[in-house]
Amino acid sequence: MRFHTILLAALASLVIATPLPSDTDVSLERRQSMNSNDLEKGDCKSVAFIFARGSTEIGNMGFVVGPGVCSNLKSTLGSDKVACQGVGGAYTAGLIQNALPANTDSGSIKEAVKMFDLAAKCPDTQIVAGGYSQGSAVIDNAIQKLDDSTRDRVKGVVLFGFTRNLQDKGQIPGYPKDQTKVYCAVGDLVCSGTLIITASHMTYGLNAGDAAKFLASQVSV
């Protein structure tokens, strides 16, 4: 019973720390940036960026860091070279899934795998990926489930507020560490294997530019 009380308190802190923008605060441009479906639209470009948002974030890209990485990547490589795709569908970014052993649920992982498989259908596309908070666990687990040929086409991954940072020792099991960059802000207790959310967990938008540069350095365009 005590565990459930602590868990509920931790999940409640997630809601408090991740306020949803009100309708009056969200411009049309910002709402559009929170959703990106280039791969689902059939856009085969030189680079595909797949991103999984954090818990309670709206859209399929979220608003804390996903859209920023996408826009910076397009600015760096050229908007005609980059397709951005958020993980939506079965991945609802709910709170309770954080408490599962994989820090997310199997349906969400399968949804991300589906996006990687979609990108792999583009024969000349190099794949990069990212995830924030619960989304980092989604991407981590999804990459482990890819077949070898698809995983080999994933050139770089960025993880923000990595919820499996402690469990997976700051990397994605079975994926090259030098192709992975983990962002864990000072004071972000999520990176220490807890569900405790602090203000630091909301700061990763500051790393969007650096993350895009890292991903750009991993591909050849």
Curated annotation (Swiss-Prot):
One of its GO terms (cellular component) is extracellular region. Disulfide bonds join 44-122, 70-84, 184-191. SMART domains: Cutinase. The keyword Iron does not apply. Its main location: secreted. Induction: Constitutively expressed in a manner dependent on transcription factor FarB: levels are unaffected by varying lipidic or non-lipidic carbon source, or by oxidative stress. It holds the Pfam family Cutinase. GO terms for molecular function: cutinase activity. It is found in: Secreted. Keywords: Disulfide bond, Hydrolase, Secreted, Serine esterase, Signal. It is an enzyme of class 3 (hydrolase). The active site is at 133 (nucleophile), 188, 201 (proton donor/acceptor). Residues 1-17 form the signal peptide. The record marks 55, 134 as: Transition state stabilizer. Its EC number is 3.1.1.74. It catalyses: cutin + H2O = cutin monomers. GO terms for biological process: carbohydrate catabolic process. InterPro entries: AB_hydrolase_fold (IPR029058), Cutinase/axe (IPR000675), CUTINASE_1 (IPR043580), CUTINASE_2 (IPR043579), Cutinase_monf (IPR011150). Catalyzes the hydrolysis of complex carboxylic polyesters found in the cell wall of plants. Degrades cutin, a macromolecule that forms the structure of the plant cuticle. Also degrades suberin, a specialized macromolecule found in the cell wall of various plant tissues. Belongs to the cutinase family. This is Cutinase 3. It comes from Emericella nidulans (strain FGSC A4 / ATCC 38163 / CBS 112.46 / NRRL 194 / M139).
